[in-house]
From Swiss-Prot:
Protein known as: Large ribosomal subunit protein uL22c
Subcellular location: Plastid, Chloroplast
Entries under SUPFAM superfamilies matching the protein: Ribosomal protein L22
Organism: Helianthus annuus
Keyword Protein transport: no
GO biological process: translation
GO molecular function: rRNA binding; structural constituent of ribosome
Keyword Ribosomal protein attached: yes
Any single Gene Ontology cellular-component annotation: chloroplast
Its job: This protein binds specifically to 23S rRNA.
InterPro entries according to UniProt: Ribosomal_uL22 (IPR001063), Ribosomal_uL22_bac/chlpt-type (IPR005727), Ribosomal_uL22_bac/org-type (IPR047867), Ribosomal_uL22_CS (IPR018260), Ribosomal_uL22_sf (IPR036394)
Subunit description: Part of the 50S ribosomal subunit.
Main location: plastid
Span of the signal peptide: none
Length: 154
C-alpha cells in the first residue's frame, strides 16, 4: 500500500495592508523557483510588496526545517497565491464639513514550499515484505477480467 507523506509546508499571512493586485505582481515572479533564488529576487525587486512576501517565504522555510528537518537547498515554492482580504473603510475630512470615503484594501498571501528531496509516497508493502519474506502477495483485483487488463466499469 502506498501512504502519502507530507512533503509540503506552508506559511500564511493574513490582513496584509496592500492591494491583492500589487502583491500578485511580485508573487508571479517567484512561483516555482527555489528558495535561495526567491530570496535573491525579493531582495532586489523595488516593490513594497516584497518585504511581507520575503518574511512569509522565510517563515515557510523555517517551518520546513523545524517540522520535517528539510535542508533549505531542497525547497521549491510549489504554490503561491494571493487572495483579496477585507477592505478597511476610513473617512477623510474635506472642506465645508464634508468627508470622503477612503478604502484601504488588504490581502491574504499563502506560500507553499515543497521539499524535492523527499519521496511523496512511502511503499509500506515493500517495508513489510522485507520484514516478513514468507508473506504471499498477489497483485490481482477482484473486479478484473481473467484476461488481465480490462476493468469492469460501465
Amino acid at each position: 500500500m502506498l501512504n502519502k507523506r507530507t512533503t509540503e509546508v506552508y506559511a500564511l499571512g493574513q490582513h496584509i495592508s496592500m492591494s491583492a493586485h500589487k502583491a500578485r505582481r511580485v508573487i508571479d515572479q517567484i512561483r516555482g523557483r527555489s528558495y535561495e533564488e526567491t530570496l535573491m529576487i525579493l531582495e532586489l525587486m523595488p516593490y513594497r510588496a516584497c518585504y511581507p512576501i520575503f518574511k512569509l517565504v522565510y517563515s515557510a522555510a523555517a517551518n520546513a526545517s523545524s517540522n520535517m528537518g528539510s535542508n533549505e537547498a531542497n525547497l521549491v515554492i510549489s504554490k503561491a497565491e494571493v487572495n483579496k482580504g477585507t477592505i478597511m473603510k476610513r473617512l477623510k475630512p474635506r472642506a465645508r464639513g464634508r468627508s470622503f470615503a477612503i478604502q484601504k484594501p488588504t490581502c491574504h498571501i499563502t506560500i507553499v514550499m515543497k521539499d524535492i528531496s523527499l519521496d511523496e509516497y512511502i511503499d509500506t508493502d515493500s517495508i513489510a515484505w522485507s520484514q516478513n519474506k514468507k508473506k504471499d502477495t498477489t497483485m490481482s483485483y477482484y473486479d478484473m477480467y481473467s484476461n488481465g487488463g480490462t476493468w469492469d466499469k460501465k
